[in-house]
From Swiss-Prot:
The active site is at residues 34, 201. It comes from Emericella nidulans (strain FGSC A4 / ATCC 38163 / CBS 112.46 / NRRL 194 / M139) (Aspergillus nidulans). GO terms for biological process: arabinan catabolic process; xylan catabolic process. This is Probable arabinan endo-1,5-alpha-L-arabinosidase A. The lineage of its organism: Eukaryota, Fungi, Dikarya, Ascomycota, Pezizomycotina. Its main location: secreted.
Length: 322
């Protein structure tokens, strides 16, 4: 999620691939920030959630669209008693035992007074969401992390985890109760960029084959229309992997993700600038799909002009390639 007052650290590693495919097609409501994507089991309809408008969301018959705006998940804001509870950020959506879970972040720019909340619905239809308030993952200035950008993940044993964090000491993980409405354990660090402003956030964990892939965004995410960073310091998507969901993530060069490791999956190219805020979705036709927001430099650099992007991922090398 965005902390536009903070400068980004420079990218330290080259990606597996240097030539990137253009984003997949998008029609309809395509302006977005911090997308989260899921497909409804009952009818195959796609739902896409995003920062803004108290978690705005849209639906479509395919990932390409046409996307139609639905409204807000929590039109009355969050019950969490923190500043920012009427301006919710960085959703994540998962299906848990037939119920759709949407995580959201409550915070204000540059603040560690943050919490990750939960809303649920059986159908994802408008006005069917129940706010459960805080998951128990919160932060203030006494914590080494910032409790935003939550991502739920279930490992092969059925255990649920929450990945979260932005800047400060970057990405943390905590085991969740089952069902995962509340935290069950203390948290531990799984990714850290020691250089610069520790500009890592937006973790998303995805299992493919024998590996758990930890995707994250690194760099300056926002405010490009008024203050663009030095070349290479804008948002980009990186990844580390592990044979366990709970740590020991390394990049393609063997560098630990807690020591600044991270292999580039997608960065600025052609008219695509600052891709990030990503997730990975298993499409029934396309297979693994990386989705994200980005600036189209032929349109404009404002946050309100950011677009929904997606690309099929190729894991044949053991690493995700766009």
């Amino acid at each position: 999620m965005y902390l536009p007052t903070l400068a980004a650290s420079a990218s330290l590693l080259v990606g597996v691939a240097h030539g990137y495919a253009s984003p997949g097609a998008c029609s309809g409501a395509c302006n977005i920030h911090d997308p989260a994507l899921i497909r409804r089991e009952s009818d195959g309809k796609y739902f896409r959630f995003s920062t803004g408008n108290k978690i705005s969301y849209a639906s479509a018959s395919s990932i390409e669209g046409p996307w139609t705006a639905i409204g807000s998940v929590l039109p009355g804001g969050s019950s969490i008693d923190l500043d920012g509870n009427d301006d919710l950020w960085a959703p994540d959506v998962q299906l848990v035992n037939g119920v759709y879970y949407v995580l959201y972040s409550v915070s204000t720019f540059g603040s560690q007074n943050s919490a990750i909340g939960l809303a649920t619905s059986d159908t994802m239809d408008l006005n069917t969401w129940t706010d459960h308030g805080s998951t128990g993952i919160r932060s203030d200035s006494s914590k080494p992390y910032n409790a935003i950008d939550g991502n739920l993940f279930q490992d092969d044993s059925g255990t649920w985890y929450m990945n979260f964090g932005s800047f400060w000491n970057d990405i943390y993980q905590a085991q969740m109760k089952s069902p995962p409405t509340a935290v069950a354990s203390s948290s531990y660090q799984i990714a850290y960029q020691p250089a610069g402003e520790h500009a890592v956030e937006g973790a998303y964990l995805y299992k493919y084959g024998n590996y758990y892939y930890l995707f994250f965004s690194e760099g300056k995410c926002c405010g490009y229309d008024s203050s663009r960073p030095a070349t290479g310091e804008e948002y980009k998507i990186k990844v580390c992997r592990s044979t366990t969901a709970t740590g020991n993530f390394v990049d393609a060069n063997g560098v630990s993700c807690t020591s600044g490791g991270g292999t580039i999956v997608l960065e600025s190219h052609d008219n695509v600038y600052g891709p990030g805020g990503q997730g990975v979705f298993t499409d029934p036709t396309l297979g693994p799909v990386l989705y994200y927001h980005y600036v189209d430099t032929t349109i404009g650099y404002a946050d309100s002009q950011k677009l929904f992007g997606w690309n099929v991922l190729d894991f044949s090398s053991g690493w995700p390639v766009v």
